[in-house]
Every structure is written in structure tokens, then in C-alpha cells.
Amino acid sequence: MRLIASSFLALALTGAIVTGPAHAADLIDFWDKPQHGGNSFNRLPPDEAYFKALSSYGATWVRLSYDKWKPAKRDYLIGDADKYEGIPAADLKTLKETLDRSDKAGLKVVITPLSLPGMRWSQNNGNKFDGRIWQDKAWWAEAASFWRDLARELKDHPGVAAYNIINEPAPEKQNGLAEHADEKAMQDWYASKKGSASDLVAFYETVIAAIREVDPATPIMADAGWYAAADAFNYWPSGLSDQKVLYSFHMYEPYAATSAPNMKREKPYAYPGKVPFGEGEQNWDKTRVASYLDQPVQWAKDKGIAPNRVVAGEFGCMRRWTGCKAYLEDVLTTLDKDSLHWAFYSFREDSWDGMDYELGSKKVHWKYWDAIDAGTPDPVKRSATPEFEPIAKRLAR
């Protein structure tokens, strides 16, 4: 795909671009009141029945990732994370058709890449972390080119509610800052990296500027660093300069308890209970959940950012973990207290059953795994369960 012609770029720089349809000007208004939805991280592009099922619970949006879909080249939509040369036409066609199905079901979509040029998602990279984009700004230019191209293609689609520039960035990883470090350590680290290729804030500004050359209206969703940790906005000196930005964090803390490895422990960490976190161990209960989740809300308040621009883009726990239902209830109680947007992880995932709450607390049927091996649609039927109840009852409100 060719990049912007010089004449078009000149129009962009002079502000002479004509906006798209009338709906474009109102896109940010969708986010003025709390919106609740789910994450779609499936290996096959979801069909209309999938989106209708999510909508039938009362969801209003879906955070859509496409990186598990079969790509035309090495990496879906970006062609090759090692060298961006345009969006493959076949990949774009499939994405647009999927957006049409979601729109028909009444769901807004947040476009969510797991990979960018210079940052291949670890699960598509032999489970190895790829942090090239945080080491060399040459990758920033390729990422900006990709997003400029994608925004040009999607800016007029009625189903798109935001562009989530990259899922769970981690410029801090293997780069001198411990996960869940204290606020001063975070701020000192950022001061030492400001202006470098590790500067997440500057990266976002660069990519947003490229998007705005072709699309002045679609909101941007920006994940915090350290895999979108709720405490990782703490080092940001301010919000981003664009006025149509949503600030997103993910909630799986304490990760040692909510994640898959805990299920393999002889005695899994319980909730409520003491769990490793950061450099030590902490007692996690509804009070600790609330205080942890207060951090992005307080950060936004301190920076003059409205609470309706803060999003819990993901949250969840292993459905077979005994503490999961109580954990979900406590997380959601806190999110709703602050009237935040949220999307649970995940809805009817066809490649991993760990946080698919409609499956209940039992092992999934063997035909689920057979379908994965065969590359065929997931045949397992879903229904509301007690494990899904904390989410379902709120979607229905």
C-alpha cells in the first residue's frame, strides 16, 4: 500500500482536510457515558451470531484483536513486523467484513492490534518479548505509517468507536524499571528516558499525529505502560495533547493469583489472601483492589482528565479459580463506583478457555481442543453461569 501522496500531506498540514460523514464528529460522544463490553481475541474472525450474543447480554462495545487470524503474509494487517510495506488487501477485507457484522449486531468496535512494526506479539514470536520499537525510533515511523494507512481505511466505518494504538505496551520491560515500582522510581525512570525510543508518551504523540493527518474524529485509546498496568500512568507528566483520547488500563492484579500458573500450584493463592506483588507480598481483598484501581482515576483527576475518558480495557481471572467470582465482583464494584468504561476478558474465546466465564467452573469439552487443532469453528455451546453472573448482571443494567 502506498503512503500518503505529498499533495494530500500538504492538505493535512494546512488543515484543509474535509472530514468524513456527519457521524464522525460525534464519535467521542459515545464515550460520554459508561460503556460496558467484552474482549474478542479469537483465532477466527467472529461471525454475526457471536456479536449478537455479546450484544444480547447488554454489551455496547467490543475490543477486537485480529492478531490470531490467518494472515496473508507473516503478520496480520501489518504484513511483516520486521518491515512494514503496506496493509495486505486480503487482511483488510476480512477486517472490514468483521466490522460490518459487529455493526449489524449493534456493537461499537475498538480496533486493538497486539503487534506493530518492531513489536511482534510474543505469542506470534516464539513466546519471546519483542521490544525493538522501544529501542529505535525508526520503528515509530513504521508504526505511524501503518496507523495512518489503517485510519484512512476505517475512518468512515460506522462501527468503529476508537483506535487502541497498541495492546499492553511495555517499554519498561528489560529496561531498568521494575514492575509495580513505587511512584518516585517510575518518575525517575521516565525522566531518564524522556525523549528516547522508550518514551511511551512521545510515541503516542507521534502515532496520533499521523492518524490525525487522515482522520480528525475517531477517538484514540492509549494503554498505560508495563502491560497496561493500572499504576503505570503514575509516571506520565500529563495527558496527551489530543482531546479525543481514552486512557486505558488492564486489571489482573495480583497476577500471581488471577493467572493460569496459579492453577498449577499445589496450594493456589486464594482471594482474599496474601499474594506476591511487586517486590514483596500483600494481602489482597476488596479494599486493596479498590485502592489499586483508584490510581488511574486519581492520576486522571490530577491531570484534569475527565473520568469518562478512563477505561478498564481488560480485566479477568481464571474461571476455575475458587476466588474468581468474588474477585470479579470486587473489581466491577470499584469500576462502577467511578463510572468507568470497561470490557471484560474475554467473550467466547475459541483458542483459550481460561477466562471464558460462560463455560462455568468445569473443564471444557474435548471437542473444543479438537476444533483448535483442526482450525475449525468452536463447537462448544455457551450459556450464562454463576461464574459469569458478576459481569452479566451489570451488562443487563
Where are these regions (language model features)?
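Aromatic-lined substrate-binding rim segments of carbohydrate-active enzymes
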Residues: 48-121, 142, 200-215, 221, ...
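Short, acidic/polar
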Residues: 42-55, 143-146, 289, 293-296
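Boundary/entry segment of secreted carbohydrate-active catalytic domains
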Residues: 25-49
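Aromatic-rich peripheral "rim/lid" segments of glycoside hydrolase catalytic domains that contact
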Residues: 322-397
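Active-site region of glycoside hydrolase catalytic domains
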Residues: 123, 131-282, 294-318, 337-343
